[in-house]
Design a protein with these regions (language model features):
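Catalytic-loop motifs flanking and including active-site residues across diverse enzymes
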Residues: 1-2, 88, 92, 171
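Glycine-rich phosphate/diphosphate-binding loop of Rossmann-like nucleotide-binding domains
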Residues: 1-38
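Short, well-ordered alpha-helices that flank and scaffold nucleotide-derived cofactor binding pockets
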Residues: 7, 11, 98, 177, ...
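Structural motif
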Residues: 15-17, 32-33, 54-56, 104-108, ...
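Generic beta-structure capping elements
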Residues: 21, 60-61, 154-156
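Short, glycine/serine-rich, charged loops/turns that create anion-binding
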Residues: 23, 113, 158
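Glycine-rich phosphate-binding loop
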Residues: 38-110, 114-141
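Glycine-rich phosphate/adenylate-binding loop
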Residues: 101, 116-195
């Protein structure tokens, strides 16, 4: 969804910074691409650029855990079993949501396999997002590895909007309109203009 949203935003005339891990899809040509390889690089890049944004959309499926120790050499086989210690990665969405001086609209994604809306609302509140996009990724025909999606957009004021199953490019165009309208209303209250 990230690349589709970036493309839709560019089509609408927005300036787009795309912070992306390795992907099989070509990034939009006119986006300012910042390539990253690890969750730590993603965290640092997002924090470096977030305050330059009017709208910050976090839809990358960043791993929740990473190896505690990284080996620069091959780990030799030592027996039948091997345990790998994992530690939590830094939570990018949570850290941005809790910034005291945040001036941008914060939009997160909740890819869920059960209790989709309920879990998304919890994430919206816990991470202090303005909007969260909930999508059910339990089926093979929708979500991350599919060209189609259907989503529920949940707003911090309790409102929600559903976008029915459609190609991701269509969903992305609708999301960009919703994000822009939300930001315009929010910034109008603060007497600020979005670029």
């Amino acid at each position: 969804m990230g690349y589709a949203i970036a493309e839709a935003a560019l089509t609408e005339g927005h300036h787009v910074t795309l912070i992306s891990g390795p992907a099989f899809v070509q990034p939009p040509r006119n986006a300012n691409l910042i390539p990253v390889s690890t969750s730590d690089e993603m965290f640092e890049a997002v924090h470096r650029d977030a305050d330059k944004c009017d709208i910050c959309v976090l839809c990358a499926a960043v791993a929740d855990y990473k190896p505690a120790n990284v080996s620069s050499t091959k780990i030799k086989k030592r027996g039948a079993k091997f345990s790998l210690e994992l530690i939590p990665t830094r939570d990018i969405l949570d850290s941005l949501g809790h910034k005291q001086d945040r001036q941008f609209v914060l939009i997160g994604f909740a890819a869920e396999t059960e209790h989709v809306e309920e879990n998304a609302v919890k994430k919206l509140r816990a991470k202090h997002c303005d909007i969260i996009i909930a999508n059910d990724v339990s089926g093979a025909d929708s979500g991350m590895e599919s060209d189609v999606n259907e989503v529920t957009i949940l707003f911090r004021n309790g409102e929600k909007t559903k976008l029915s199953r459609a190609p991701k490019k269509n969903i992305a165009r609708e999301l960009v309109k919703i994000f822009s309208n939300f930001a315009t209303k929010m910034f109008d209250k603060k007497n600020v203009t979005i670029n």
